[in-house]
Curated annotation (Swiss-Prot):
Keywords: Acetylation, Cytoplasm, Isopeptide bond, Phosphoprotein, Repeat, Ribonucleoprotein, Ribosomal protein, Ubl conjugation. The modification N6-acetyllysine is found at K79, K85. Belongs to the eukaryotic ribosomal protein eL14 family. GO terms for cellular component: cytosolic large ribosomal subunit. Disulfide bonds: none annotated. Residues 159-218 are annotated as: Disordered. The gene is RPL14. This is Large ribosomal subunit protein eL14. Residues 196-201 are annotated as: 2 X 3 AA tandem repeats of K-[GA]-Q. It comes from Oryctolagus cuniculus. The modification N6-succinyllysine is found at K85, K207. The lineage of its organism: Eukaryota, Metazoa, Chordata, Craniata, Vertebrata. Its main location: cytoplasm.
């Protein structure tokens, strides 16, 4: 932002420290680079030389000739209504609040604390009401859905189709050995039979069954 507060004739300044601290004055003439001739006819400040280091320039400018007498300065001050405009600025309000805070007692600070807590509670409740109303408008009521259907839909949405087919194949492969268990047992029983004779070897002779004993003697 461009700086526009320059030292000039008619510029209104705020006295920050010194015997006239907190009052407004108007620059009537510039003496040198360090001092200016000021006058405050409506703030009870006599015409005198004042250093720039104790002045803070404001945005207000009065229209009167160079080295004008006090009556012309007063007339321009009242015409521009400087006192009312200054009281309405944020600068003046901050100064007033700072002075009021410095004069507060312990009981005054306690009352301010309780008032702030009450204000914050009211604001919080109102914000919650607005949030609930916004949620009700944003999400209309839907028909109730069974929990199982909701879980299945969520699982289907999370698991892609390829992964689902792979999982189905794995499950089928795991179930297949359990069904073929009897066949494996049968194969084990067949393996218990005597091995076949290899080529060039005679099969082992099998004993003929013994004849049954009869009651007649030869």
């Amino acid at each position: 932002m461009v700086f526009r507060r320059f030292v000039e004739v008619g510029r209104v300044a705020y006295v920050s420290f010194g015997p006239h601290a907190g009052k407004l004055v108007a620059i009537v003439d510039v003496i040198d680079q360090n001092r200016a001739l000021v006058d405050g006819p409506c703030t009870r400040v006599r015409r005198q030389a004042m250093p720039f280091k104790c002045m803070q320039l404001t945005d207000f400018i009065l229209k009167f000739p160079h080295s004008a007498r006090q009556k012309y300065v007063r007339k321009a001050w009242e015409k521009a209504d400087i006192n009312t405009k200054w009281a309405a600025t944020r600068w003046a309000k901050k100064i007033e609040a700072r002075e009021r805070k410095a004069k507060m007692t312990d009981f005054d600070r306690y009352k301010v604390m309780k008032a702030k807590k009450m204000r914050n509670r009211i604001i919080k409740n109102e914000v919650k009401k607005l949030q609930r109303a916004a949620l009700l408008k944003a999400s209309p009521k839907k028909a109730p859905v069974a929990k199982g259907a909701v879980a299945a839909a969520a699982a289907a949405a999370k698991v892609p189709a390829k992964k689902a087919t792979a999982a189905g194949k794995k499950a089928a492969a795991q179930k297949a050995p359990a069904q073929k268990a009897p066949a494996q047992k049968a194969a084990g029983q067949k393996a218990a039979q005597p091995p076949k004779a290899q080529k060039g070897q005679k099969p082992p002779a099998q004993k003929a069954p013994a004849p049954k004993a009869s009651g007649k003697k030869a």
